[in-house]
Amino acid sequence: MDSSKEALKERKKMAKDEKKRQKLEKFLAKKTLEIGVSKPRKEYRKEGYDPLQVEGKWYKLWEEQGLFKPVEGGARYVVPIPPPNVTGSLHIGHAMMVSIQDAVCRYKRMCGYEVLYIPGTDHAGIATQNVVSKQLAREGIVVDREGFLKKAWEWKDRHGSRIYEQLKRLGTSVDFGRERFTLDPGMSRAVADAFVKLYEKGLIYREPKIVNWCSRLLTTISDLEVNHEEVMPNTYLQVDGGKYEFGVIYHFKYPITADKGFSGDHLSLPTIEVATTRPETILGDTAVCVNGRDCRFSPEGIKEMLGDVPHGCRIYGVNPLTRDVIPVIFDDYADMSFGTGVVKITPAHDANDFEVSKRHGLPCKVVFDEQNRVVVEGEFKGLKRFEARKAVVSKLRDVGLFVSKKGHPQVIPRCSRSDDVIEPIIKSQWWLNCKEMARKAIEAVEDGRISILPEGAEKQWYKWLGNIRDWCLSRQLWWGHRVPAYKAPSGKWYVGRTKEDAFLKMRSECMGSDCDLSELEQDEDVLDTWFSSGLWPFATLGWPEETEDFLKYYPNTLLETGSDILFFWVARMVMLGLELTGKVPFSQVLLHGIVRDAHGRKMSKSLGNVIDPIFVIDGCSLEKLISTMRSGNLDEREVKRAEAVLRQDFPNGISRCGADALRFALLSYTSGMKDINLDVLRVEGYRRFCNKIWNAHKFVKTMVDELAGKNGNGPVCKDDYGKYIVSSAELPGPSEEGPVEWILRRRNETVEEIRRTLDSFNFMGATQAIHQFFIYDLCDVFIEVVKKSKNEKYIRVLFRVFIDSMKMLHPFMPFITEEVFSNYFNGSISVSPYPETDGSEHESKFSVTLQITRHIRAKAESNGWSKAVVEIAPGGDVNHADLRFIRSLCRKIVELKIISDAEDGPYEKVGGSRVLVRQTE
């Protein structure tokens, strides 16, 4: 290869390398390659940074010093933690959530804000009852309600404390003096008060309606807790203890007559063809629906089907299974383009049919009980619903009314908690009318009282709230807030904050009649978990009482949470906050995406890819990962699948990385609402970053120790306790020294960039900025210059810039930065002022020197030269004084020649100079 082609190749490589440094994703990809995916798990060498030794001591000291309690003086900044469920331990998704929140809180605290970061946990009604029930079943224990609640509280105490320990290990700077649990007495009072107030406003009411029934959990669930699974034609699903076919549409004949009192042989009647995906519900049909524009049911069409009947005569269907005579009704609900254009109406087991029944005054006939067994008298009684389906189809075949069975794409509603196929049933429940509250919540975003980030999320907000339905509050569970409603012997319900409160209301209506407190029976149901969670921003501060905390810290400032619960939780907090307090609960909503595994799969215990963040912090063997998974509530089939995933993804276990590396890795991924494919092994790259910080600290400490020893009472000296005192002269003024001016300019640029990105919640940009500054500018360049020169001015600048780097890193890496800071100063870095730009214009020509340096490095590395000879003809902004820095930064240079004329020969122009790099002979 000739020299010009070689030079072109090298220039392209340099440009590519520079581009990589400016783009985070490419940088992270490079780091992933450095880590590798099949290296065995390694422990730290004794001389390296050991996160466990450092991280283990600091949280207790922070708490003892009360550093996370709000300190008056600055503007208030309040962040409520989305309370984790007490169903188990925190997972990596929680770790990302608290890493984001804590980075914001620590940053704001250092900027002088009065920060309150509120911790707590959620009782998680359905989820906790489910895991406790599984545990009891596995142990063969049968309990009543009181016994179950005792077991559930034991579970909460065990796992709630585990969650708080995990939060501490992650360095979360919450004020544990204000921690709350959603079933605490104070929270329970708030829930009862909210229910009563909403009831008295006419927003809560009790009514029989179609609900989503889960027969495995034996409770209703909300629309948001239903997953709508699209299945292809003729798909078999495991449900109700067997495998059943879905994705099928059945056509059958419905006998019709003009005789309302028909009681003869229905098989001799004319028929119309009906299509359904649920033939088992024919047992509950109370009407047949056709479209009024369907010409088949015009007077002429009816005459053609039924013969000579009086004009305007009503026609009826005869249920092919029960022989009940039911009306044929006309409604636009019947879609003439779908199926046969004729729809059977089963109001008790279909939400749309239920609405049709209300319009036409149809009765509701229940087909299934709460265990999905047929309750209709006759040959099908007692069959489970999908067994009944097969029996019904067989019966229709036998009597000649079956037409066909065709594959058809279908959407199956499944419980997000149990995976059961939801059965719509009618139940009398407590409902919250959300329409007007939703309108107010929309207005709060439209007028700017609440901002939702990242941009674009508002569209989802408007769409969902604009189509909101009433909220079913009742849940058929034992674990949760009992509905504060009490039933009298008359059947009337009385709502009160307490039983005594409800009794007073009942007695006021007794009109002198005898009535007794014991006659009132509290509703057995509990409230939807999201109702109590919806009060979180203000109930945690003492509402409904006007406590000092409530008056001072409400509304909150920032609500940071996952985008997947925008409607489950965030919308309900806004609706309830506006309705009950008259104020928005917070001014900003920040949403993040879902954390998935390295393969892009959603994390699931049954898949074996849910990782406890403590396993990443402390390290974990494959054996422990498997044993921990086996100790859960998975069945044997799920255990086998999960174990296979663990063996594939973590053949050598997980290396010890520390909390700082985990936090930094999670934050470096975070960009808006995009889902994150987290490769746990990539955290190891940031563990090595911690080691780089530690080694830099050891060098800086050596340098400033020497400087302090020389200066006595100089600009950097020690107090009587061995801590450093830095005078106002710590930073030299403008100087002709290239490296000093250059590093101060880069320091200012980095401070400005991190402040900008953190203020806009761009954690990816913030972590990229400090990582690149620390590695490529401070360590790779300035520390190398200081090593060679040991110039006092350089050391003082190094000290200041290094400490500022620790402060910039602190919101992301609280432990190692606190450890480093404590080696130099009294007090905590967490309450030290965040760096600001110094206001000086630091102009430096040193960047040209670095250009030449990088060219020399790239040339030597690309050719595999361990030693090189360099010839430079200085020009442009480079003079002979700059050349000493080039030598100190390029260790591969064994000879550096300064020449005056480089017009001839294979010299390349770099930064105004002519440069030749060649291998030593």
From Swiss-Prot:
Q: Which UniProt keywords apply?
A: Aminoacyl-tRNA synthetase, ATP-binding, Cytoplasm, Ligase, Nucleotide-binding, Protein biosynthesis
E.C. designation(s): 6.1.1.9
Q: What subcellular locations does the record give?
A: Cytoplasm
UniProt motif 'KMSKS' region: location: 602-606
- Protein name per its UniProtKB record: Probable valine--tRNA ligase, cytoplasmic
Q: Tell me the InterPro entries matching this sequence.
A: aa-tRNA-synth_I_CS, aa-tRNA-synth_Ia, Anticodon_Ia_Val, M/V/L/I-tRNA-synth_anticd-bd, Rossmann-like_a/b/a_fold, tRNAsynth_Ia_anticodon-bd, Val/Leu/Ile-tRNA-synth_edit, Valyl-tRNA_ligase
List, in alphabetical order, the Gene Ontology terms for molecular function in this entry. aminoacyl-tRNA deacylase activity; ATP binding; valine-tRNA ligase activity
User: Which GO terms of the cellular component aspect does the record hold?
Assistant: cytosol
Q: Where is this motif: 'HIGH' region?
A: 84-94
Pfam families for the chain:
Anticodon_1, tRNA-synt_1
Family membership noted in the UniProt record:
Belongs to the class-I aminoacyl-tRNA synthetase family.
Question: Where are the annotated segments for Disordered?
Answer: 1-20
Q: Which CDD domains match?
A: Anticodon_Ia_Val, ValRS_core
Q: Where does ATP bind?
A: 605
Q: What is its main location?
A: cytoplasm
Biological process terms from the Gene Ontology for this record are: valyl-tRNA aminoacylation
Catalytic activity entry: tRNA(Val) + L-valine + ATP = L-valyl-tRNA(Val) + AMP + diphosphate
